[in-house]
């Protein structure tokens, strides 16, 4: 195991209290009457939207009082075993913006979003008792940490409280696959062809109808700041390819711009390997990662675009990328914790190294390869890296430096604004040769730089020092 690889500033996160403020429901007489009636609660994790959201539809049509709950779990803001902060400033700020907008959207539906800091398994039980919760609706998660919290919660609350969980993060719902998860193809192309032929994408779910105003709790819930989470704020970089904010509203604005205003979608296949600017790719991944945008919303907007504007290779290719996202989720659903193992899902052994100096040189953009360095500096300064960049720096880390690929994956988890556990570890396994790449390729970084940064503009942008550095 590698000792602390990054600076000591973040060490204060270990001392972060599990609950900074203990919330107590402040009830008016009206609310007291309300709580006598059975209530339901939507427990939010990576499904941070109101539209096309199964849990909210189920809850608001139940006939009961409805509340929502989100907790900033301190485990997500401490340090990993590799020494990296689990969540750095870029993604944390994006999440704060997402929760802020979600709270406002729910207020418009007369639903209170309870926001806390702490382990949900410790915070939720008191609300279940005080609000007379009889059913908890939530999105199914299957990776280790999420399952542990769910198991703790089930132990902590009365057995008569019902759990209603749903898969709501896929393009192709698991129930609509033409095979069992255990029979999932180990090669993406096989998965894609079978699903395209035999599966279908479900229609978007209806919007929620506002509830009576009596449903609202009088208490206001404060959303934590970066400082509350023990994270130092970072200034937005003027050259960032991801200058966007969190939340479903911003996601919809981006979708409308990329599709209808600029019609960039028509050229997506030609531009998707770009490196500079906000429009070479869709940039939907960050909203997809925390569930403030659903893949179905994107898919059906593509279908509308194909009917009204043009249907071509580019419109298909964005669906193709959504299928890759689905595939890595299904790979983790099939293989569970093996996606975190050094040997990966192939149980393939390599001679990996844990050279701290090499790891830090990679992180700081001080390797022998300028193209790798430029991408790593971009990541450190903006929380973003292009898909082409990610493939190259990961291949260099695992195949050239021969470093334990899980360290690189953990650093991406820390830094990326669009971190998604399934895509991150699925892609890292793929590149490292322990995942779903049947050819076990190694990127020639210099040839890649010549092809995708022929004039060297991207490398100059990030490798040249400024007056303030």
Q: Language-model features: where?
A:
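Charge-dense, low-complexity intrinsically disordered segments
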Residues: 85, 89-93, 242-249, 362
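Alpha-helical packing segments of well-folded alpha/beta enzyme cores
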Residues: 55, 98, 102, 251-254, ...
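Active-site-proximal binding-pocket segments
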Residues: 277-468
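N-terminal amphipathic/basic-hydrophobic helices that include classical n-h-c signal peptides
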Residues: 1-26
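Glycine/tryptophan-enriched, flexible segments
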Residues: 182-341, 452-453, 457-469
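Hydrophobic residues within well-ordered, non-membrane alpha-helices that form the packing/core
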Residues: 106, 157, 192, 259, ...
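Trp/Phe/Arg-rich N-terminal binding region typifying the photolyase-homology
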Residues: 22-203, 377-378, 423-427
């Amino acid at each position: 195991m590698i000792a602390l690889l990054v600076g000591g500033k973040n060490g204060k996160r270990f001392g972060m209290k599990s609950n900074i403020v203990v919330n107590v429901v402040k009830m008016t007489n009206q609310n007291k009457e309300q709580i006598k009636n059975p209530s339901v609660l939507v427990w939010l994790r990576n499904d941070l939207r109101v539209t096309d959201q199964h849990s909210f539809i189920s809850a608001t049509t139940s006939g009961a009082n409805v509340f929502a709950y989100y907790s900033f779990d301190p485990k997500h803001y401490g340090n990993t075993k590799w020494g990296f902060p689990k969540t750095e400033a870029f993604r944390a700020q994006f999440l704060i913006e997402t929760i802020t907008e979600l709270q406002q959207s729910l207020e418009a539906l007369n639903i209170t979003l309870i926001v806390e800091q702490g382990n949900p398994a410790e915070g939720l039980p008191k609300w279940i008792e005080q609000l007379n919760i009889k059913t908890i609706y939530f999105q199914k998660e299957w990776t280790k940490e999420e399952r542990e919290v769910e198991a703790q919660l089930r132990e902590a609350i009365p057995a008569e409280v019902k759990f209603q969980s749903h898969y709501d993060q896929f393009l192709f719902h698991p129930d609509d696959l033409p095979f069992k998860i255990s029979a999932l193809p180990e090669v993406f192309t096989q998965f894609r062809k079978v699903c395209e032929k035999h599966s279908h994408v479900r229609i978007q779910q209806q919007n929620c109808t506002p509830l009576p105003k009596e449903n609202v709790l009088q208490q206001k819930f404060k959303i934590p700041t970066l400082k509350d989470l023990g994270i130092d704020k970072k200034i937005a970089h003027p050259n960032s390819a991801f200058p966007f904010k969190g939340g479903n509203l911003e996601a919809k604005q981006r979708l409308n711009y990329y599709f209808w205003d600029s019609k960039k979608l028509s050229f997506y296949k030609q531009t998707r390997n770009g490196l500079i600017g906000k429009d070479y790719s869709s940039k939907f991944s960050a909203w997809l990662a925390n569930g403030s945008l659903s893949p179905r919303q994107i898919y059906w907007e593509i279908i509308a675009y194909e009917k009204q504007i043009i249907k071509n290779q580019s419109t298909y290719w964005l669906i193709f990328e959504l299928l890759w996202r689905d595939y890595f989720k299904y790979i983790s659903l099939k293989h569970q914790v093996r996606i975190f193992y050094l040997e990966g899902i192939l149980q393939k052994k390599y001679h990996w190294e844990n050279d701290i100096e090499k790891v830090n040189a990679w992180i700081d953009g001080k390797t022998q390869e300028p193209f790798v360095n430029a991408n790593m500096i971009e990541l450190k300064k903006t929380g973003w890296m292009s898909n082409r960049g990610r493939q190259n720096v990961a291949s260099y880390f695992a195949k050239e430096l021969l470093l334990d690929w899980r360290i690189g994956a953990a650093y991406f988890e820390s830094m990326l604004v669009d971190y998604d556990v399934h895509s991150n570890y699925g892609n890292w396994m793929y590149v490292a040769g322990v995942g779903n790449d049947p050819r076990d390729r190694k990127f020639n970084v210099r040839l890649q730089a010549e092809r995708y940064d022929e004039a060297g503009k991207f490398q100059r942008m990030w490798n040249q020092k400024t007056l303030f550095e």
